[in-house]
Design a protein with these regions (language model features):
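Eukaryotic nuclear/nucleolar intrinsically disordered, charge-dense low-complexity regions
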Residues: 193-196
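Flexible coil/turn residues that form the inter-helical turn or adjacent wing/linker of helix-turn-helix
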Residues: 161, 176, 357
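Phosphate-backbone binding and catalysis cores of DNA-processing enzymes
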Residues: 1-154, 241-308, 465, 469, ...
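A conserved hydrophobic secondary-structure block that centers on an alpha-helix together
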Residues: 169-171, 175-183
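Pre-Walker A segment
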Residues: 140-161, 166, 172, 342, ...
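Basic, low-complexity terminal or inter-domain segments flanking catalytic cores
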Residues: 5, 61, 92-94, 133, ...
Length: 783
């Protein structure tokens, strides 16, 4: 609102502003009837946030360019988010796994009608070693098992509050598998269609009207016994409850969109809002202790739950974090104290302590919210920014894990047997991993800007923004108190620190006697043999890229030296050389000027000639045309967005409903024809040589040139032109519209080589740019 006043030259002190949280007729009518003035305290708080974040972002980013690598960035929130991920990764790497043994037993029970049941019980305490577990099983060989106690206690489970921005992001990640940015884009579309309330909010409260509508919906669908009206208070640090919680605009609508993402997210929001006003679920938990005749001090325990009244569970069950252990809920058969049980099998299984779980997008949002870092509107862009390939601080990927053996002792029919089993450990799906660059930047900032990287400092800054919003602090005073010591520290770091490469010495090369070390190079981490000041004149340092899964922090000397065994020539195939190599994007087979990726789970050093030929032939098969259309080949491929077909520079995404590996020629041609027809309808005019086209857009005809869209001028009545009218425009007329919107659109760009800037000049550049912005904004706000 304040920005509109600035642009339109309106006085914010007398200009009225309307507020609505949903795009519905009643909400907008009510807003028009109840206008208010622009809250300049809120404006100042936002200005303070913007200026501070730009100061930190611009100046620290420029420092990183000079000290580490170009195109890196830093920020008050994003750098702390990366730090969380880095610290968790180091915690996992330093975690010492401890083995232990857990005892469980299966008992056969028969009820009065002669029906057989199996109940599972466990020893509450674990054994530290196999000897203790074996001794326990030995004592159970001839034991009688009797029910000692049965404890039944009622439980009540309460529904979760309606969604805030962060809880929606977390739950959509866990239940729907959405990324944070995917959730926000989908929620934005729902909001723009008037289907949900505003999706950037800290509030868990609902309006009286919404509660009334939800109550009516619950009563009509499930009955009045399911209704329990509730009000919720935010548990979030520094919550700003300017809006309602996220809820449907119209509670009686459950089907709203044919677009799958929109419908699924809407259903999630609808169910959560409805459940929030429903009665508690009433459960009954039964705890049974089973005595062991040969060991009176020991017992096994079985637990079960039954739902007496489902309440809100009829609609919605909140999911759990990966970090929280899930507990099996079983129903126990009718049992009585003193009842004897028939042991079918008892096992003592070796288990291992687990390190803390890596962050997912959902759990990272939860942690940032708990620490009071950032705001609902910043979580999605922050996570997207730290995962951008240009920065390369964090990656989200699937890791297959490693095989681990464990021991199992089994007592069955009075005999104890031991066997070794296998499991996969360390597998990860959609977890966030810090890269070497992420770790290097965090260490550099931690060392030189400890205060900014401190979690409590970032949270305290958020509190100061709230104080400014309450009108109790001048925003420019807060900026001044922060900026001067920060800038002094920045200048000191610029002058007194050298370039940072994360160099770590691993040992000495036995052949040359040169130092072996790992460091960050221009295109990523490398192992280097021989520093520039120690190699002989006729020699050059040797370099090797790290393999996937290796890091600068924990690679060993032996692992580093293995990397120099590549590239390795295997021999000739069809009179052409076959070589195994390691590149920036992983290991590969090089053959006939082509590069074929080696699967991630295969060691490139173990690849034989036979396996290399197999990979070459697989590549040939994959690249072979699946069909021909208009005398041009249709080929298959897989990209970051899934499988696709390519024909004549036209890409066709293949839906999961098709078996891509078994796609036949007829289906491939049908998909290409459908895409071709769709593209033909999209273009009204297309000047390929000029790379200019007129297309049918969502809001009418539009011009596309240079990766930008340009609108046609509206007619005298203010209406958009039709497709027929757009078709009559000549190329020169279209060019004139482009130039009117972008005067430099057809100016040829020339590359300018930048001169190297001295340290002294760098200092003045960093000092002056943000300072100018502060003064400009300060004047605007005071005006």
């Amino acid at each position: 609102a304040w920005h509109l006043c600035e642009v339109l030259d309106l006085d914010p002190k007398i200009t009225k502003r309307i507020v609505f949280h949903e795009i519905t007729k009643p909400a907008i009518q009510a807003a028009v009837l109840n206008p208010r003035k622009v809250d300049l305290d809120l404006v100042n708080a936002q200005q303070a946030r913007r200026v501070l974040d730009r100061l930190v972002g611009f100046e620290l980013s420029e420092l990183l360019w000079r000290k580490i690598k170009n195109n890196l960035s830093a920020g008050r929130v994003q750098s702390v988010a990366v730090k969380l991920i880095v610290e968790r990764e180091r915690e996992i790497r330093n975690f010492e796994v401890t083995p232990f043994f857990k005892v469980s037993a299966l008992f056969k029970v028969q009820d009065k009608e002669g029906r057989n049941y199996t109940i599972k019980a466990e020893r509450p305490e674990r054994f530290d070693d196999m000897a203790g577990a074996r001794a326990f099983l030995e004592s159970c060989k001839k034991a009688a098992f009797t029910i000692k106690t049965i404890e039944v206690k009622p439980l009540r489970r309460k529904p979760a509050a309606p969604f805030t921005t962060s809880t929606l992001q977390q739950e959509a990640s866990r239940k729907l598998g959405f990324s944070v940015s995917r959730t926000m884009v989908t929620a934005q579309r729902l909001y723009e269609q008037g289907l949900i309330t505003y999706m950037r909010t800290d509030s868990t409260s609902l309006s009286a009207t919404a509660i009334q509508q939800i109550t009516q919906e619950i009563t009509s669908s499930f009955g009045s016994q399911y209704v329990e009206q509730r009000t919720y208070k935010s548990k979030t640090a520094n919550a700003q409850e300017a809006h309602e919680a996220i809820r449907p605009s119209y509670i009686d609508r459950q089907e709203v969109s044919s677009i799958r993402d929109e419908q699924r997210l809407y259903e999630l929001i609808w169910k959560r809002a409805i459940a929030s006003q429903m009665a508690d679920a009433e459960l009954e938990k039964t705890i049974v202790k089973i005595g062991i005749s040969t060991m009176p001090q020991e017992y096994l325990q079985a637990e079960g739950e039954i739902i007496k009244f489902d309440g809100f569970l009829k609609v919605y069950l909140e999911s759990e974090d990966e970090e929280e252990e899930a507990h099996d809920e079983t129903i126990l058969p009718p049992l009585t104290v003193g009842q004897q049980l028939d042991l079918r099998k008892m096992e003592a299984i070796q288990r291992f302590t687990r390190p803390p779980a890596r962050y997912t997008e959902a759990s990272l949002v939860k942690k940032l919210e708990e620490l009071g870092i950032g705001r609902p509107s910043t979580y999605a862009p922050t996570i997207s920014k730290i995962m951008e390939t240009g920065r390369g601080y964090v990656i989200k990927e699937l890791r297959e894990g490693t095989e681990r053996k464990f021991e199992v002792l089994t007592l069955e029919q009075g005999v104890i047997k031991q066997h070794t089993d296998k499991e996969i450990t360390g597998a990860a799906k959609n977890n966030l991993f810090p890269t070497d660059m992420g770790m290097l930047v965090v260490d550099f900032l931690n060392k030189n800007f400890e205060e900014i990287m401190n979690y409590s400092f970032t949270a305290e800054i958020e509190k100061k923004f709230d104080v400014i919003a309450d009108g109790k602090m001048e925003w420019h005073q807060m900026i001044d108190s922060f900026y001067h010591p920060f800038h002094k520290k920045l200048e000191d770091t610029l002058q007194n620190t050298g370039r940072e490469s994360g160099k770590r010495i691993l040992g000495t090369d036995p052949k040359s006697g040169n130092t072996v070390f790992v460091r960050m190079a221009r295109f990523g981490p490398v192992v280097q043999i021989g520093d520039t000041d120690e190699v002989k004149e006729e020699e050059k340092p040797e370099f090797a890229n790290l393999k996937a899964g290796q890091s600068m922090e924990n690679i060993s000397f032996e692992q580093a030296m293995e990397l120099f065994k590549l590239p390795k020539t295997l021999g000739n195939f069809e009179d052409k050389e076959v070589t195994i190599g390691q590149g920036r994007f992983g290991p590969y087979v090089k053959y006939d000027e082509g590069f074929i990726s080696i699967p991630r789970n295969e060691d490139p050093l173990s690849i034989t000639m036979e396996r290399a030929i197999e990979l070459i032939n697989d590549k040939r098969t994959a690249d072979a045309p699946v069909a021909n259309y208009k005398q041009m080949p249709i080929t298959k491929g897989k990209g970051r967005f899934g499988p696709f077909l390519k024909w004549n520079d036209l890409y066709v995404n293949v839906s999961p409903k098709y078996n891509f590996d078994q796609l036949d020629a007829r289906t491939a041609i049908e998909l290409v024809v459908a895409k071709e027809e769709k593209e033909a309808k999209r273009f009204i005019n297309n000047w390929e040589e000029e790379k200019i086209s007129v297309q049918n857009g969502r809001w009418g005809p539009t011009i596309f040139f240079g990766k930008k869209y340009f609108n046609f001028p509206k007619d005298k009545e203010g209406n958009r032109i039709t497709a027929e009218e757009a078709a009559n425009y000549k190329l020169e007329e279209v060019k004139a519209i482009i130039e009117a919107n972008d005067p430099k659109a057809f100016t040829k760009k020339t590359k300018v080589t930048k001169a190297k800037v001295s340290t002294t000049n760098a200092k003045s550049t960093i000092a002056k740019k943000p300072a100018k912005k502060v003064i400009t904004i300060k004047k605007k706000v005071k005006a």
